[in-house]
Regions:
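Gly/Ala-rich beta-loop-alpha elbow adjacent to hydrolase catalytic centers
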Residues: 223-227, 231
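The feature captures the conserved acid-bearing segment of alpha/beta-hydrolase catalytic domains
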Residues: 138-141, 242-317
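Alpha/beta-hydrolase active-site loop
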Residues: 159, 190-213, 233
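Domain-level recognition of soluble alpha/beta enzyme cores
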Residues: 24-147, 341-344
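Bacterial N-terminal signal peptides that target proteins for export
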Residues: 1-8
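Short substrate-entry loop that stabilizes the transition state in hydrolases
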Residues: 128-185, 275-278
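Alpha/beta-hydrolase-fold serine-hydrolase catalytic core, especially in secreted/extracellular enzymes
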Residues: 25-43, 52, 59-62, 84, ...
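Conserved hydrolase catalytic core segment
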Residues: 233-242
């Protein structure tokens, strides 16, 4: 299909087919990230930079104030990196929340507007929680593979704090910026919005190349929901991307995206109610959407690992959302039928583990990690009924 139709159908494809528990008590649920840190400490560096090739409308401190039009595109960049272990004060979730208020204003907090309301809603009850990263910590000597993380629609760069810090502790430099529209902070569900976030990914790769602790010859793009779709756009257009990770993204090919020509490995996580056949039937059912070939079905010339998390709903692919008080209040509508919120949290931890092993296998070329990916979930210790996996090896691309 044309990209315009693809974008219009995004919300329908993303949300369709879900079933939820109606009577689960969520008052005692507490999300716990149980994966252990790697051999490194974690540093966080915040870089306030701008893309002068694109213009942007800056928000004022009040919705009634006029905005600056024609300014360069601000990209508050969060860099998580391996650092020597230390006893220095670590970040709190509240420290991360404070960063979000200066996403586009760089040092001058914006106290209202859509991004701030979003943060206040989903960070309620989390501000005192300790994180792993030490702000501006010393860098660990060496060069490490790069992971560019693309957030979901209109989301801050911090929506998966645990995942980003976890990967940094395991020897990756993880870089993220907010999901923003083409000309303003609010993301738009259209072609310019999708292309803008994809361009941000390439901008961050340019930035990563200049860092003293990166191995820019090994780069992965990862994204959640809308961010996974924009990561696909970036990977198709920027040949520096060596691997792709999708966290429950709506993947349908269109425009200049040709999955049957892609040769990089893809790790695609999805909810249990999504299957390759279901997505393909959506494509063929013209009452649902007018879609191009399903990306996963057409991804034949790059390795494809498709991991279905059976106990997980779409919103549970973010640790930040699972931690929030709002999630606990509304959780009954989130958990898939016959599964508990605790099982959804366990599934998130396994998602982080499989992400790590995928990156180890394809960016660090680790044979043990490659074997992990080939084993069944049960052989890797995953509890029964939480995960289903299919691994399809790449076939040769005809020339």
């Amino acid at each position: 299909m044309h990209l315009a139709t693809r974008i219009a159908a995004f919300g329908i494809v993303m949300c369709s087919g879900a079933s939820f528990v109606a009577g689960q008590d969520s008052s005692t649920f507490r999300f716990v990230f149980t994966e252990k840190p790697g051999q490194f400490g974690v540093g966080l560096r915040v870089v306030e930079q701008s893309d002068h090739s694109r213009t942007f409308q800056l928000e004022g401190g009040s919705s009634e104030k006029s905005a600056d039009v024609g300014s360069p595109r601000p990209l508050q960049t969060l860099v998580w990196y391996p650092a020597p272990s230390s006893n220095n004060r670590t970040m709190t979730f509240g420290d991360y929340e404070a960063l979000i208020k200066t996403e586009t204003s760089f040092g001058m907090p914006v106290e209202d507007g859509k991004p701030q309301k979003f943060v206040e809603s989903y960070m309620e009850g989390t501000t005192d929680l300790p994180a792993w990263a030490v702000r501006d910590a010393e860098m660990q000597p060496g060069r490490f593979p790069v992971v560019i993380y693309a957030p979901s629609l209109n989301a801050p760069a911090t929506e998966n704090i645990e995942l980003c810090e976890y990967l940094a502790s395991q020897g990756f430099v993880v870089i993220a910026s907010p999901s923003m529209g083409a000309t303003s902070r609010s993301m738009t569900v259209d072609i310019p919005g999708a292309n803008a976030e994809a361009q941000d990914i390439s901008f961050l790769i340019d930035f990563a190349v200049k860092l003293p602790d990166t191995d820019a010859s090994e780069v992965a793009a990862a994204g959640y929901s809308w961010g996974g779709m924009t990561a696909l756009l970036a990977a198709a257009r920027d040949k520096r991307v060596d691997a792709l990770i999708s966290l429950d993204s709506s993947f349908v090919a269109s425009g200049d995206i040709h999955p049957d020509q892609m040769t990089i490995p893809l790790l695609a996580f999805s909810r249990g109610d999504d299957t390759l056949e279901y997505s393909d039937s959506q494509r063929k059912d013209k009452t649902q959407c007018d879609c191009g070939p399903n990306v996963l079905n057409e991804w034949t010339h790059g390795d494809l690992l498709h991991v279905k998390l059976l106990a997980t709903s779409h919103i549970q692919f973010s640790s930040l959302y699972q931690r929030s008080e709002r999630f606990r209040k509304e959780a009954m509508q989130f958990s898939p039928a016959d599964y508990s919120l605790e099982e959804g949290a366990v599934s998130y931890n396994w998602m982080a583990r499989y992400t790590l092993e995928f990156l180890n296998a394809y960016l660090k070329h680790d044979d043990i990690a490659a074997l992990f990916l080939k084993r069944t979930p049960a052989e890797n210790g995953v509890p029964k009924h939480l995960m289903a996996i299919s691994l399809r090896q790449a076939s040769a691309l005809s020339r």
